Swiss-Prot record:
Classification via InterPro entries: DNA_bind_arc, PDCD5-like, PDCD5-like_sf
GO CC, alphabetical: cytosol
Annotated GO MF terms: DNA binding
Matches recorded under NCBIfam families: PRK04239.1 (NF003268)
SUPFAM superfamilies recorded: Double-stranded DNA-binding domain
Species of the source: Methanosarcina barkeri (strain Fusaro / DSM 804)
Family from the record: Belongs to the PDCD5 family.
Keywords noted in UniProt: DNA-binding
Stated name of the protein: DNA-binding protein Mbar_A0455
Length: 122
């Protein structure tokens, strides 16, 4: 009877140690996940700041305002236009700042042609 009791005590002790080890590993994994997410967020924020700095240089205030409005209503098109503008600027194909009218023209070129259909009653 005494031997069973000591075996149970030993098993309980092993279980406690294993549980403590698992909890420690989970805490370490959680900490590294938090650090990775933080670093990813920092890189994303830095990239966004660089993008905004470039756009400030190549767009007039009115054009920037239009782009901001576009990004709120249609984020995918706004992002696509931003990337296109930045690539044009980096390749040196923009002689001056882009005005609101020029931005509208670029937007029109990006939009697919819509077919007009009309219904006539006989």
């Amino acid at each position: 009877m005494i031997a069973m009791s000591t075996m149970d005590d030993e098993l309980n002790e092993i279980r406690k140690r294993r549980l403590a080890e698992i909890q420690r590993q989970q805490a370490q994994n959680q900490q590294s996940d938090i650090q990775a997410a933080y670093q990813q967020e920092q890189a994303k924020a830095e990239m966004e700041a660089q993008k905004q700095a470039i756009l400030r240089q190549i767009l007039t205030p009115e054009a920037r305002e239009r782009l901001t409005t576009l990004k709120m209503s249609r984020p995918a098109i706004g992002e696509q236009l931003e990337m296109q503008l930045i690539s044009l600027a980096q390749s040196g194909r923009l002689p001056s700042q882009i005005s609101d009218e020029q931005l509208k023209t670029l937007l029109m070129k990006m939009q697919p042609k819509k077919r007009k259909t009309s219904i006539t009653r006989v």
